[in-house]
């Protein structure tokens, strides 16, 4: 089935309705589990989830937490995941809502409501390599070694569960609003508290006229993006992958593998051509970009500061602060247009630490940074938060962002698995 055959109205062919699977279970709280790439260094978190869920139907049984990647039981766990997916489908635990979208409201711990639309993207329009000017692009460099273990899970899996957050640059705040304003007219699919302090979530079915209006508004947004960024690119980025970069890259890799093994006519409408994501607005008040600072230990702070001033600084430019011992220095980075301070600093540190002693760590919070910087042979570099309107131009100008550029909320605020979609015929 092709998701593009929807009539004559002018609509997006990048973000599309899908045949969305919704669980028919007694406990949605036990069904919904946080993204597999969270709490990877805290196996006790996953032990608590396992104990809470038990044998009840849950997405915990349909995914492999990354804390278990590389373990001796990995292959057996993957086989069990794929078997459980089939069993859930055979037991009618998953109801299909054809050619639909789901509007989601997630109440975070700070009380703010994060809104999104669950739908499918066409992987033909997505690339995780910076040299390809696709409409959908990764925001961080893809670590290629992280893809094969994920492919083992997805390639033979009958269904997918999304934790990918796709961001649109809707500075006018128009795209999601057209659905929010008509929320009272939509069928509510679920509402419940998420486990492990994940907040509260509710979802509504988006179909009929509201769906058509949303897709038309989305197409208008895509056209505006072409005009907005015409000076940066003939084929500008329209959507950015905010969370779940490696999961989406895995979906693309599986689709490319399928293309190699089949003629185009046989797979052009294959469900694996698409991937389920949640679309959110970069400019929504609930989206908070928090800076991630750098601390370098086991190094000579004076020498590092001297090299940094020589290679990266001028009398004017982006202000940053460096801390070492009881000292604080204010520096001004010499940046080219659309370049981020974190890009300049990370490039410098990568080069400097190849030839000099020192280890880098990534720190949240200025107070923690300052405290750590008091230690001997340690220097902390405080970086400014990235402005929201810097994201799209930076990716289009410099390719993917440096690792640990910014943080979008706390771990417990990441997406939970709820909706699904068949990816096999």
Task: Go through each PLM region and give its residues.
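Short beta-strand segments
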Residues: 167, 242, 278, 382-384
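C-terminal catalytic or substrate-handling cores of phosphate/nucleotide-
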Residues: 293-405
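Catalytic or ion-translocation cores adjacent to nucleophile or general acid/base/metal-coordination motifs
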Residues: 245-307
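Active-site beta-strand/loop microenvironment that shapes enzyme catalytic pockets
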Residues: 216-262
């Amino acid at each position: 089935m092709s998701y593009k055959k929807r009539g004559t109205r002018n609509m997006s062919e990048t973000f599309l309705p899908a045949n969305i699977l919704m669980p028919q279970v007694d406990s949605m709280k036990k069904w919904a589990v946080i993204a597999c790439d969270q709490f990877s260094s805290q196996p006790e978190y996953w032990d608590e989830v396992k104990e809470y869920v038990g044998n009840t139907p849950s997405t915990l049984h349909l995914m492999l937490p990354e804390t278990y990647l590389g373990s001796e039981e990995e292959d057996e766990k993957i086989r069990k995941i794929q078997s459980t997916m089939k069993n859930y489908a055979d037991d009618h635990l998953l109801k299909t809502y054809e050619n639909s979208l789901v509007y989601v409201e997630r109440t975070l711990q700070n009380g703010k409501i994060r809104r999104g639309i669950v739908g499918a993207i066409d992987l033909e329009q997505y690339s995780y390599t910076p040299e390809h000017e696709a409409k959908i692009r990764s925001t961080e460099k893809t670590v290629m070694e992280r893809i094969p273990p994920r492919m083992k899970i997805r390639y033979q899996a009958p269904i997918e569960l999304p934790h990918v957050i796709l961001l649109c640059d809707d500075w006018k705040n128009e795209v999601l609003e057209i659905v929010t304003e008509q929320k009272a007219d939509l069928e509510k699919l679920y509402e419940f508290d998420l486990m492990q302090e994940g907040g509260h979530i509710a979802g509504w079915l988006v179909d009929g006229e509201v769906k058509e209006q949303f897709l038309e508004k989305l197409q208008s947004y895509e056209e505006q993006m072409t005009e907005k960024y015409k000076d940066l690119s003939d084929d500008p980025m329209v959507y950015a992958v905010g969370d779940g970069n490696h999961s989406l890259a895995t979906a693309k890799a599986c689709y490319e593998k399928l293309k190699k093994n089949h003629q185009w006519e046989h797979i052009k409408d294959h469900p694996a051509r698409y991937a389920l994501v949640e679309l959110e607005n970069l400019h929504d008040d609930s989206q908070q970009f928090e800076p991630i600072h750098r601390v370098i230990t086991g190094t000579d702070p004076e020498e590092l500061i001297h090299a940094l001033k020589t290679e990266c600084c001028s009398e004017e430019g982006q202000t940053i602060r460096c801390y070492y011992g009881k000292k604080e220095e204010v520096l001004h980075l010499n940046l080219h247009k659309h370049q981020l301070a974190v890009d300049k600093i990370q490039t410098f540190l990568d080069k400097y630490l190849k030839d000099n002693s020192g280890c880098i760590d990534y720190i949240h919070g200025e107070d923690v940074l300052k405290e750590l910087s008091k230690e001997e042979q340690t220097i902390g570099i405080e970086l400014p938060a990235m402005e929201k309107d810097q994201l799209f131009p930076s990716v289009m100008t410099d390719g993917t962002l440096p690792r640990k550029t910014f943080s979008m909320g706390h771990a417990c605020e990441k997406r939970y698995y709820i909706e699904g979609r068949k990816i096999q015929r």
